[in-house]
């Protein structure tokens, strides 16, 4: 805990009034940022796999059309035709799977962004800055004392800054 002011001190708006050790919050922010970058990389990979699946679909569709034409004319074997149908259907399924991978990666990015934002918000909460210029008129806590408060209700008064 850092408490660089004393009762009677003159402070300017934005001066540090209270600070807690930010190390774990910095680490959490770094982890969240790394997770976001990993998610973005996963999206890029999914898009690349989708492009590859699209190319394979075009090739499979051409082979299917050729094989169908040859088979219908009696010039192609049933095995070749069946293989072309199978490859064509498989390539369609691959496209669908890669589209879902892209969707999943997009949702993962949104989740990672939310985690990063939460970590950044928590890091910002490691400091309390003077809301206005003035004099510290009441300092009710000392270094080492605990302060109660939650996200749902207001915590204890640590100090007052009067103008």
Feature roles, as predicted:
Residues 1-42, 73-80, 139-142:
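Long, amphipathic coiled-coil "stalk"/hairpin helices in large membrane-associated assemblies
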Residues 4, 18-19, 56, 63, ...:
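Soluble periplasmic/extracytoplasmic beta-strand elements of cell-envelope proteins
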Residues 8-17, 67, 112, 119, ...:
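A structural signal for short beta-strand/turn segments enriched in small hydrophobics and glycine
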Residues 14, 91, 159-163:
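A short, hydrophobic secondary-structure junction motif
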Residues 15, 27, 55, 79, ...:
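Extracytoplasmic/periplasmic beta-strand context in beta-sandwich domains
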Residues 25-33, 50, 54-57, 79-81, ...:
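Sec/SRP-type N-terminal targeting helices
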Residues 37-99, 123:
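Alpha-helical hairpins and coiled-coil heptad-repeat segments
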Residues 44-45, 99-146, 163:
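Elongated periplasmic alpha-helical coiled-coil
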């Amino acid at each position: 805990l850092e408490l660089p002011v004393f009762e009677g001190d003159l402070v300017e708006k934005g001066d540090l009034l209270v600070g807690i050790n930010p190390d774990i919050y910095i680490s959490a922010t770094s982890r969240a940022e790394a997770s976001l970058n990993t998610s973005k990389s996963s999206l890029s990979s999914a898009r690349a796999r989708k492009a590859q699946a699209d190319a394979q679909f075009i090739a499979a569709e051409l082979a299917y059309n050729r094989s169908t034409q040859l088979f219908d004319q009696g010039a192609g074997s049933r095995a070749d035709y069946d293989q072309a149908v199978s490859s064509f259907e498989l390539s369609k399924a691959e496209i669908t799977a890669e589209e879902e991978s892209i969707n999943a990666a997009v949702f993962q990015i949104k989740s990672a962004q939310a985690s990063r934002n939460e970590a950044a918000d928590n890091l910002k909460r490691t400091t309390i800055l003077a809301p206005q210029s003035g004099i510290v008129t009441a300092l009710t806590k000392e270094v080492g004392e605990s302060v109660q408060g939650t996200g749902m209700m207001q915590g204890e008064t640590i100090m007052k800054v009067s103008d």
